[in-house]
Amino acid sequence: MRIAVICFCLLGIASALPVKPTSSGSSEEKQLNNKYPDAVATWLKPDPSQKQTFLAPQNSVSSEETDDNKQNTLPSKSNEDPEQTDDLDDDDDNSQDVNSNDSDDAETTDDPDHSDESHHSDESHQVHFPTDIPTIAVFTPFIPTESANDGRGDRCGLRTEVKIIEVPPINVQSPDATEEDFTSHIESERCMSTKKTSRLTDHSKETNRCELSKELMPKAKDKNKHSNLIESQENSKLSQEFHSLEDKLDLDHKSEEDKHLKIRISHELDSASSEVN
């Protein structure tokens, strides 16, 4: 049980790591090896003591892989050239021969005097697992295509930025302008000038009104004062005349009373004298 658990652990580790395929693989695997040679740096090297337990599942995996490769290559034979199909068939036959030789070598691993060549063949066969090779994106550096301006002193490598001065657009009147446009422009200018003059006149009128109002205010105050003086004088005159009339009436009334008294006295004297006689 322990050996089986160890085998499953090793299989999981081996399937997780990118592995270089053997030379007996299909043409697609060879093309992948040629495109990505850096993925070969991480090879799996298990212990030689566990080869017997490890090679039994490998043979079954390799046979399944060859069957899958055959199935993948069969539908594409109609589109490929006959020379390419012959090459693929030769590669498959070679892979089957190599797998049979590897199985024979695996049976002879029980001998103590096993050569180093069998060890290397076992390792090469052991590495044969269908793993997804990681794709490495190749970034090409940016190379400027502009010509070098040596005469001016600029260098394209330094990527000097040239400041662009933006010139404001100038409205140039074309000589083909019609008279109507010209007259409309003149009329608009006249309207603007009349508006400005009307504003100026309105402002001047307002200022004149303010000045006149300021000048008329003290004059009105003086007139009010003069009218008040005249009214006071007239009132005083009227009061004096009224008092004088009252005095005259009093005098007249007194004179009339005196006359009546005198008449009475005279009548009494006359009556008294007649009685005496």
From Swiss-Prot:
Q: Where is the signal peptide?
A: 1-16
Q: List where Acidic residues composition bias occurs.
A: 81-95
| Superkingdom of the organism of origin | Eukaryota
GO-annotated molecular function: extracellular matrix binding
Q: Where is this region: Disordered?
A: 38-129, 184-277
Record-linked InterPro entries: Osteopontin (IPR002038), Osteopontin_CS (IPR019841)
Sites carrying a glycan are N101
For whether the record's keyword set contains Phosphoprotein, the answer is yes
| GO biological process annotation, one example | cell adhesion
Arranged from A to Z, the UniProt key words for this protein are: Cell adhesion, Glycoprotein, Phosphoprotein, Secreted, Sialic acid, Signal
Family to which the UniProt record says this protein belongs: Belongs to the osteopontin family.
What's the name of the protein? Osteopontin-K
